[in-house]
Structures are given as structure tokens and as C-alpha cells.
């Protein structure tokens, strides 16, 4: 049992280190390196929405919106709950003129915000609704 807890703690620390490193690289506009780190993160922790969201953001920074859209969609298939990926997906869909699909993505995020009573997420949903 102790070994399992120790492995979990190590895994959690590794995921946090990957996220922090990738985020720092992204903030330094070292996009190619950040992509490598976030790919590793989604491999190690596929259920962590942050890796998918950050990897998508890297591709958006490179103007690779189709890849970002695919990543945000894949996140919803792999991770348990991906409301922030849904909002990012809505933003891209709206920019492509796919208004109904964008609204659907926003509403998926809204359901999670209501269920979890996450005020920050609700604020993001409200902002996207105003843009829609």
C-alpha cells in the first residue's frame, strides 16, 4: 500500500513539474519545446485537462487551429471532464462560423460549471456566452 501511495505522489509531482515547465516554456514563447513537454504530460496524465488545454494553446499560438480543435475534442473523449477545452473549442468553432457547434460546446461547459458550482468556470462560460 505504501508503495502505491509513493508511486502516486511521485506521479503527481511529475505531472505538476511537466505542467510548470511547459507553462514556463509557453510564457517564454518557446512553443516547440512546450509542445514536447505537454505531449509528455498528456501521455503520463491523459485525464488531466490542463495538458490538453495547454497543448491546444501551443498549437493556437502557431496558428494551427485545426490541430488545436482536434486536441480539444480528443480531450473530451479521454479526460473525465473538460469544460475549459470545451470553451476553447467553442472559441475556434465560432471563429470558423460554426455558431451552433460553438453554442453546444459552451453549454457542455455550463453544465459542468453548474454541477460543480465552480464560480471561476461559470465566469468563463458567461464570457463565452456574451461572445457567442
Feature roles, as predicted:
Residues 12-43:
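Alpha-helical segment of the N-proximal tetratricopeptide repeat
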Amino acid at each position: 500500500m505504501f508503495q502505491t501511495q509513493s508511486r502516486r505522489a511521485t506521479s503527481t509531482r511529475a505531472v505538476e513539474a511537466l505542467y510548470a515547465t511547459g507553462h514556463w516554456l509557453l510564457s517564454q514563447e518557446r512553443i516547440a519545446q512546450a509542445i514536447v513537454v505537454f505531449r509528455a504530460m498528456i501521455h503520463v496524465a491523459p485525464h488531466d485537462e490542463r495538458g490538453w488545454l495547454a497543448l491546444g494553446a501551443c498549437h493556437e499560438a502557431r496558428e494551427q487551429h485545426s490541430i488545436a480543435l482536434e486536441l480539444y475534442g480528443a480531450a473530451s473523449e479521454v479526460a473525465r471532464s473538460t469544460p475549459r477545452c470545451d470553451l476553447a473549442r467553442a472559441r475556434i468553432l465560432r471563429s470558423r462560423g460554426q455558431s451552433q457547434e460553438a453554442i453546444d460546446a459552451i453549454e457542455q461547459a455550463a453544465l459542468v460549471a453548474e454541477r460543480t458550482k465552480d464560480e471561476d468556470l461559470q465566469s468563463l462560460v458567461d464570457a463565452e456566452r456574451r461572445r457567442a
